[in-house]
Amino acid sequence: MKALQTLMSGESLTQDQTREFFQRLIKGELNDIQVSAALIAMKMRGETPAELAGAAEAILSAAKPFLRSDTTVIDSCGTGGDGSNTINISTTAALVAASMGLAVAKHGNRSVSSRSGSADVLEALKLRVNLDPSDASTQLADNGFCFLFAPHYHPGIKHAMPVRQTLKTRTLFNLIGPLVNPARPDAQLLGVYSEEWVRPMAETLQRLGVKRAMVVHGSGLDELALHGPTRVIELRNGELNDYHVTPNDFGVPSAPLDELKGGDADFNARILEDILAGGGSPAQRHSVAMNVAALLYLSGQYNDMKAATAATMEHLDTGQPLLHLRRVQDAQETYHV
């Protein structure tokens, strides 16, 4: 196989070559040795934006179809794997943003390195994570929020699971999740587990034609950080802008990372509901508000992060986000089982 020969010689694949290789992988046409060799060859050299984009195109082309309206759809998603075991910041931010009128199609999975991934905490909130695509589409249209469970939409990925479980090391698949949202969001807040991936992931989104995005790494977190500076590469109108932000840019004080410490899914779900009800600690509220502000900014509703954060804090005080979550919970009772 030419693609494998190219990789084994230390060269990178083109976007087209990678797409063709992963199309074969998700059809089950490659054996475990071929899959393992390719993943390790790319990992040792470092996956390129062309390879990430090609793999994402292959996976998206085979995904279960998801019908969405012409409204601007946004996603708040991280790679996971930062090892911080914080509360579910991006999931909480997604629900708050939906209650403020954004259409958030959150793509996610179970835990990577923490005790509670996005799917885990949503299940603890009694939300069904494996909705039929038509029901998820209805949920997004009616309530501005839906969760798209990655294994449900990308069944072909199972062909790589034996290799991934055997290798027990990060590969391209640890980066690809935020790139293969079947709703094909117009804008994304994408967190990465290591700063080395900020630019490659931003360039990958650029290749995939995403309209607006912020790729972030916040002092060890795959989120905007409250405890230190956050590296950002912003994608807008096809151009990339590289900068750093601090909590001060959002008008909130810094706080130690341990003030965002999470637990298991039930523990994190209780904190999430507390924040949505207008409670939570100052650090929890500020962290969520910063991430919501970025979503409001990416959606075009605000051009100023401080104003967007202040608006989010005021909205949290009303308790409306929790009422919105209750509507999402109630609506799913009318969907297919």
UniProtKB/Swiss-Prot annotation:
State the oligomer form and interacting partners.
Homodimer.
Under the cellular component aspect of Gene Ontology, which terms does the record hold?
cytosol
Q: Name one Pfam family in it.
A: Glycos_trans_3N
Kindly state which keywords UniProt assigns to this record, in alphabetical order. Amino-acid biosynthesis, Aromatic amino acid biosynthesis, Glycosyltransferase, Magnesium, Metal-binding, Transferase, Tryptophan biosynthesis
Q: What catalytic activity is recorded?
A: N-(5-phospho-beta-D-ribosyl)anthranilate + diphosphate = 5-phospho-alpha-D-ribose 1-diphosphate + anthranilate
Q: Where does Mg(2+) 1 bind?
A: S90, E223
Q: Where does 5-phospho-alpha-D-ribose 1-diphosphate bind?
A: 78, 81-82, 86, 88-91, 106-114, 118
Domain of life of the native organism: Bacteria
> How many and how are cofactors bound here?
Binds 2 magnesium ions per monomer.
* Annotated source species: Idiomarina loihiensis (strain ATCC BAA-735 / DSM 15497 / L2-TR)
**Full protein name:** Anthranilate phosphoribosyltransferase
What is this protein for, i.e. what is its function? Catalyzes the transfer of the phosphoribosyl group of 5-phosphorylribose-1-pyrophosphate (PRPP) to anthranilate to yield N-(5'-phosphoribosyl)-anthranilate (PRA).
Q: Does the keyword Lipoprotein apply?
A: no
The entry lists its GO molecular-function terms as: anthranilate phosphoribosyltransferase activity; magnesium ion binding
Q: Which residues form the signal peptide?
A: none
Q: Which GO terms describe its biological process?
A: L-tryptophan biosynthetic process
Kindly list the positions annotated as binding anthranilate 2: R164
Fetch the Gene3D superfamilies from UniProt. Nucleoside phosphorylase/phosphoribosyltransferase catalytic domain, Transferase, Pyrimidine Nucleoside Phosphorylase, Chain C
Residues where Mg(2+) 2 binds: D222, E223
Binding positions for anthranilate 1 per the UniProt entry: G78, N109
